[in-house]
């Protein structure tokens, strides 16, 4: 009898070790998915201006093409969400695999000497990659809701770390070896993305159909979730703010007396500072209400843009880039968790897809207008407009939070 407690204790210890191993394995695999997702942004979208400029595009032309890509991405995200909601055999996992394969094909085709083919494939890549965050977030949130021990905030932090590394490396390689390096790095990122999806397959299959039936039948989604709709409007304005800087960072850096290498370093700094806040998010969310974190992060979008406006050197831009720890770094993780609580559990796929669609909508508006603003008014006007959009976005998010949570806070998934 004396040995029984010891046996039970050992069994519990072994189970605890197994749970930890599963958590590490699941988080590592999902981290590869997030790294692939955000590394695409660092390699292809961040250097789209460089690539298109080399092919004879003006700032307005770059803005129009990237704006069109964002519009296509918005349509793709809504299409993917509706198809997954209605077709039981189609999952976001399948969509993710297919998307990574298409991205690999487009990355290879960008090397073509046929300008029309190369530009066309670059356009497809820019469109599809903007749908990847929604796909990845839906995969992760479904798996977590179905019982997966995946640490989302850690994986998302690894995604930012991957963005930082690839942005810095891409900047160096483009400056020294030419814009064609974007294609080779795109193939590397595709391999990472596919590896992550295959390794994570055992976690996501359990939750892939969790929210299909209810979502397919529900009508008037926005009418039933008014606070979410207001939040989504705010998210669009924040994405306009964010994209006006990231998508035209090359022109901004040139105005601040910098180079393509400085552009890559600034982008890398913006991403690397996100990592600590994402890793620490589970602990922060236990002490600070999630709604407060979302509102706080919204204000910092405007603060960062204003700092970019004030500084006049590459060094100043590096300092301004570091402020992303409190803007996009905190927002991107807090918003995903907050939205999961704004809507019923059965509508997670649709809500996450709409949240992710805020990025291409904001991208479409910012890229459509950004090029014309640069050509007609200049860099400083672009940064001022970005600041105003940040303030408007923060205001909408505050209204959404007040409307939804009057006296009751929404708990964050990653605080559990």
Where in the sequence are the language-model features?
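Cytoplasmic helix-loop-helix junction between adjacent transmembrane helices
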Residues: 123-158
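Loop-to-transmembrane helix entry/capping segments in MFS-fold secondary transporters
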Residues: 59-60, 146-158, 260-261, 343-355
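Helix-to-loop junctions at the C-terminal end of transmembrane segments
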Residues: 76-89, 174, 277-289, 374-375
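Structural signature of the two symmetry-related core transmembrane helices
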Residues: 92-106, 292-307, 387
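Helix-loop boundary and gating motifs at the non-cytosolic
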Residues: 20-70, 227-235, 239-266
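A late C-terminal transmembrane helix in Major Facilitator Superfamily
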Residues: 349-376
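Hydrophobic core of transmembrane alpha-helices in multi-pass small-molecule transporters
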Residues: 35, 115-133, 236, 316-330
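Juxtamembrane intracellular "pre-TM" segments in multi-pass secondary transporters
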Residues: 14-24, 200-233
